Structure formats: structure tokens, C-alpha cells
Curated annotation (Swiss-Prot):
<comment type="similarity">
    <text>Belongs to the TolB family.</text>
</comment>
<keyword id="KW-0131">Cell cycle</keyword>
<keyword id="KW-0574">Periplasm</keyword>
<feature type="signal peptide">
    <location>
        <begin position="1"/>
        <end position="21"/>
    </location>
</feature>
<dbReference type="GO" id="GO:0051301">
    <property type="term" value="P:cell division"/>
</dbReference>
<dbReference type="InterPro" id="IPR007195">
    <property type="entry name" value="TolB_N"/>
</dbReference>
<dbReference type="InterPro" id="IPR011659">
    <property type="entry name" value="PD40"/>
</dbReference>
<keyword id="KW-0132">Cell division</keyword>
<dbReference type="GO" id="GO:0017038">
    <property type="term" value="P:protein import"/>
</dbReference>
<dbReference type="Pfam" id="PF04052">
    <property type="entry name" value="TolB_N"/>
</dbReference>
<dbReference type="InterPro" id="IPR014167">
    <property type="entry name" value="Tol-Pal_TolB"/>
</dbReference>
<comment type="function">
    <text>Part of the Tol-Pal system, which plays a role in outer membrane invagination during cell division and is important for maintaining outer membrane integrity. TolB occupies a key intermediary position in the Tol-Pal system because it communicates directly with both membrane-embedded components, Pal in the outer membrane and TolA in the inner membrane.</text>
</comment>
<dbReference type="Pfam" id="PF07676">
    <property type="entry name" value="PD40"/>
</dbReference>
<dbReference type="GO" id="GO:0042597">
    <property type="term" value="C:periplasmic space"/>
</dbReference>
<comment type="subunit">
    <text>The Tol-Pal system is composed of five core proteins: the inner membrane proteins TolA, TolQ and TolR, the periplasmic protein TolB and the outer membrane protein Pal. They form a network linking the inner and outer membranes and the peptidoglycan layer.</text>
</comment>
<dbReference type="InterPro" id="IPR011042">
    <property type="entry name" value="6-blade_b-propeller_TolB-like"/>
</dbReference>
<protein>
    <recommendedName>
        <fullName>Tol-Pal system protein TolB</fullName>
    </recommendedName>
</protein>
Length: 430
């Protein structure tokens, strides 16, 4: 826990402008069919009101996963704060087989002790499945709640939780000297801050695998350029600024390489830079356009978009050469793919019959599933545990962020109030 806090402190950089959060998750579909669970409001052990609603944050996290449906506090048969106070039969009567209870104790030094227990009400009634406590300052109370959510989620599903992750995205605001902003926020939209402001467009942010850097495209020099920015100190390293197009950066999972697309010789082609030496080598060649690289877990193979068959489709190729293998065969065109962290599937923008939606391609069975029903969907990015996808879509006159579970059942949106939001990128585990 202490190590994780130190890493997050490094990300809460002093140079960044902290904002009032402008995006919040609004669930639109799928929670009713999820597993019911009880998350009892945490007992506040101090004077006045609690500085954060820890139980509410945990309930929201579990609800946002699409796998759980926390019942409303008004429906709870009791509101215990410790496992010994839980009456299992009262909860199982509501179809609930697990309950989260806890309390928050203020300390004389200004810190808070957050403790929780996950209680089994069905299999072994009254037993504690997992428990923990964290001593934190006020600014880390939400992080402590997300940590508890991660532990509860993993205990109940066997899947590592991703509630302590972040999202990067580009906001185009309405006017001002710097209308384009690259921002980072907690996955749920809280603790938003600005990484970079620009008078010219910013595009395609991509996280380094350790979460310490963002690569992105900027047009501040008068033409496109690829840069890598270190979040802890704001330092910017220019990677590529060749004539014509420089775009679509993607860090390799081992952190040693950056793939991107250049059109310096005419057609768009893929290149890979060794980040230690700065050496760049070309991966694809020919007259077709090859762009939007995404890495497989081995850091040796790329999936990418190519129009070599006429319309854009997704292909796979080893960075050391060879023949590109076509992966997509359904839909009129497929593009902007991202390979899952385990390499078992990819998500992409799939177009068919005039519609443009996010689809999932199972790389084992080659089965394709359309996940979304929103309008003009773009730039999907997968959570590090592979359970959710964030993407942008057109709503009204602007672009907003949307969430969909990897099975397509759960859907939510993250509306912004101060501009159009594009190019979401989900962080690795932090």
C-alpha cells in the first residue's frame, strides 16, 4: 500500500493544474442483471460529517464494473459496521451473498484509519472473506476506497480490480488561448488535472507500461510531432517530427520500444523506435497505408490498420519482418484496434451498413461481437484487467466518453461539461 501511494504521489505533479472534475460515470444499461451485493455505509467515528463517503465510493466502483449491483441503503435490512454485527439470513433473504462493512476513524495527527470487511452471508455465513485497513491523509481517502474495491472485486471474481487506474484524454474547450488540453483523471472522472495545454490540436495519448509517461501527437511546431512527456516533472522528449504525418504512438508492453506511423516516404508505414538508443527502423513497406499499431503481449508482434486489400482492415505482423496476416473479415472496414493485455482478443472500430461501432474480435475463435450501439464510435481503449472498454462517440454536437463491458451488457457514459472529449487511453495498473 505504501509503495502504491508513493507512485501515485509522483503522478500528482505540482506543475499540473488541478481542476474540478468535469466527467462522471452515468450508467445507461446493464446494472439490473448484475450480481446483487450489500455495501453498507461506513460508520464515521469522528465529530461532524465524514470527509468522504467511503462506502459510496466502493459501491460505485463495484457498480461501474458491470458485474455487481449494490442495493440502495434504504433497502438494507440492517447497517452494521463490523462482521460480528452482520445477520446473514437477513441479507440472503434479499438474494445477497456478500456484504461489505467498515468504518473510518480520524486520528489526532490529521490522518484517517479506514477499515473494511467483506462478509460471506451464504456459503459460510458470517465468515470474513477479506479485510484490510489503511492509514491515510485526507487527500488519499478516495484512493483507499478504490484499494478496498480492488480487493473486494478480486476476491469475488478472481479478476484483478482496476479501480486505482486512470484515463488520459484530450478535451477541446470552447475558445481561450489554449483550447486543446491533454488531461488525466481517475478512471471515474475524479482528481482530474491538465498534463499539457496547446493552441494546436493534441491527439492519440498512449501510456507507458509503468504509467509514468504519456506519448502523444502535437501540432505546436506547425506540423505533427510525436512527443513523450514524463508526468512527474513535465519533461517533454520529441520522438519524431518528420515531413508529413507523425502519429499513432504505442509503447511496447516491456517498455523498451515505441511503435508509430510515419508518411515521410509517401504512404503511411509503421516504424519502431528503441527508446534507449533512439534508433528507428521501418516495419512495413509498400504502397498501402499502414497505421494505428497496437502491441501483442510479447512486444514482438503488432496488430495494425492497413488498406492493402482496398478498405481498412486489421492485420498482424512481426516487427522483425515477414508477411502480414489479415485478422478481420467481417464488416466493410475495421480499424483502430487495441489488443487485450492477455492477447486473447482485440477491440476495434468496425463499420457495416453505414454504422460505426466498437466490436470485439476473439483471436482464438475469430468470432466478432459488436459491443456498442452509440453513434460514430472511435478510439477504443481496454482496461488493464480486460473487463471494460472506454471509447469516444458523437453525442449531439460533440464528442463524449463512453464505457462498455467486454461482453457488451453494461454501458455507461462520462459526459463532460466544458468541451468535447476524445482519444481516451486507459492506464496500466498504477
Amino acid at each position: 500500500m505504501k509503495q502504491a501511494f508513493r507512485l501515485m504521489v509522483g503522478l500528482l505533479v505540482l506543475w499540473a493544474s488541478v481542476l474540478h472534475a468535469e466527467v462522471r460515470i452515468v450508467i445507461t444499461q446493464g446494472v439490473d442483471s448484475a450480481r446483487p451485493i450489500g455495501v453498507v455505509p461506513f460508520k464515521w467515528m469522528g465529530p461532524g460529517t465524514a470527509p468522504e463517503n467511503i462506502g459510496g465510493i466502493i459501491a460505485a466502483d463495484l457498480r461501474n464494473s458491470g458485474k455487481f449491483n449494490p442495493i440502495d441503503a434504504s433497502r438494507m435490512p440492517q447497517q452494521p459496521s463490523a462482521a460480528a454485527e452482520v445477520s446473514p439470513a437477513a441479507w440472503t433473504a434479499l438474494g445477497i451473498d456478500a456484504v461489505v462493512v467498515g468504518q473510518v476513524q480520524p486520528g489526532a495527527d490529521g490522518s484517517y484509519l479506514v477499515s473494511y470487511q467483506l462478509v460471506d452471508t451464504s456459503g459460510n455465513p458470517g465468515s470474513v472473506l477479506v479485510q484490510n485497513q489503511y492509514k491515510v491523509t485526507g487527500q488519499w481517502l478516495r484512493y483507499a476506497a478504490h484499494t478496498a474495491s480492488d480487493e473486494v472485486f478480486e476476491k469475488l471474481t478472481g479478476i484483478k480490480g482496476a479501480f486505482r487506474t486512470r484515463i488520459a484524454y484530450v478535451v477541446q474547450t470552447n475558445g481561450g488561448q489554449f483550447p486543446y488540453e491533454l488531461r488525466v483523471a481517475d478512471y471515474d472522472g475524479y482528481n482530474q488535472f491538465v498534463v499539457h495545454r496547446s493552441a494546436e490540436p493534441l491527439m492519440s495519448p498512449a501510456w507507458s507500461p509503468d504509467g509514468s509517461k504519456l506519448a502523444y501527437v502535437t501540432f505546436e511546431s506547425g506540423r505533427s510531432a510525436l512527443v513523450i512527456q514524463t508526468l512527474s516533472n513535465g519533461a517533454i522528449r520529441q520522438v519524431a517530427s518528420f515531413p508529413r504525418h507523425n502519429g499513432s504512438p504505442a509503447f511496447s508492453p516491456d517498455g523498451s520500444k515505441l511503435a508509430f506511423a510515419l508518411s515521410k516516404t509517401g504512404s503511411l508505414n509503421l516504424y519502431v523506435m528503441d527508446l534507449a538508443s533512439g534508433a528507428i527502423r521501418q516495419v512495413t513497406d509498400g504502397r498501402s497505408n499502414n497505421t494505428e499499431p497496437t502491441w501483442f503481449p510479447d512486444s514482438q508482434n503488432l496488430a495494425f490498420t492497413s488498406d492493402q486489400a482496398g478498405r481498412p482492415q486489421i492485420y498482424k505482423m512481426n516487427i522483425n519482418g515477414g508477411v502480414a496476416q489479415r485478422l478481420t473479415w467481417e464488416g466493410s472496414q475495421n480499424q483502430d484496434a487495441e489488443v487485450s493485455p492477455d492477447g486473447k482478443f482485440l477491440v476495434m472500430v468496425s463499420s457495416s451498413a453505414g454504422a460505426q461501432h466498437i466490436a470485439k474480435l476473439d483471436l482464438g475463435t475469430n468470432a466478432t461481437q459488436v459491443l456498442t450501439d452509440t453513434f460514430l464510435d472511435e478510439t477504443p481503449s481496454i482496461a488493464p484487467n480486460g473487463t471494460m472498454v472506454i471509447y469516444s462517440s458523437t453525442q449531439g454536437l460533440g464528442s463524449v466518453l463512453q464505457l462498455v463491458s467486454i461482453d457488451g451488457r453494461f454501458k455507461a457514459r462520462l459526459p463532460a461539461t466544458d468541451g468535447q472529449v476524445k482519444f481516451p487511453a486507459w492506464s496500466p495498473y498504477l
